[in-house]
Amino acid sequence: SYNGSTFFGYQIQPNEISVQEELEKALSTILRIEIKTTGAGRTDTGVHAKKMFAHFDFDEEISEKLVHQLNSFLPPSIAVKKVFEVKEDFHARFSAKYRTYEYYISLENNPFSEKFAWQHWRKSLDVGKMNEACKILFEYEDFGSFAKVGADNKTNICKIYHANWEQNGNELKFTISADRFLRNMVRAIVGTMVEIGSGKLKPADLK
């Protein structure tokens, strides 16, 4: 898991700090061999991860101390929970059946959640309308309209398995699961949902 506030996503980026770079540097130092990792996803700049999977190839036996060693070497914004052996044909990205994102919106001016939630307290949101719009997402196949402009995607086809808004006090949580996500896709969907919740758009405008 990691706090993505200071990272430009998981994947290595030229001249930018990434989670993958920090993880590979730690693994290579501890295992004394160059290690390359493959993550289950890339995650956008500033996105946090509660549970991110990655795989790497290593021919020797893994020490039980590796998790402790990694957490001692990595910056405090990255935490390794477990290291375990998998089958040779396992692939962190392509073996994943689905991915889940959670997006939080604070309905109050809360400085303590500023790094972890969109502060949207000046105008109320109609959660019912936003959930009505969620149902329309299941009708989509091509999510190109929600992708970052100029993104080099081989295909914009995604399959949504779950999409829902729920409110807990002054916090809204959007949960969405899909087989894959395009760059900036979740943020774009949330932005559109907020437009619907604030009355600037109607759920039917998604069709």
Where are these regions (language model features)?
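Structured-RNA-binding interfaces characteristic of tRNA pseudouridine synthases
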Residues: 1-207
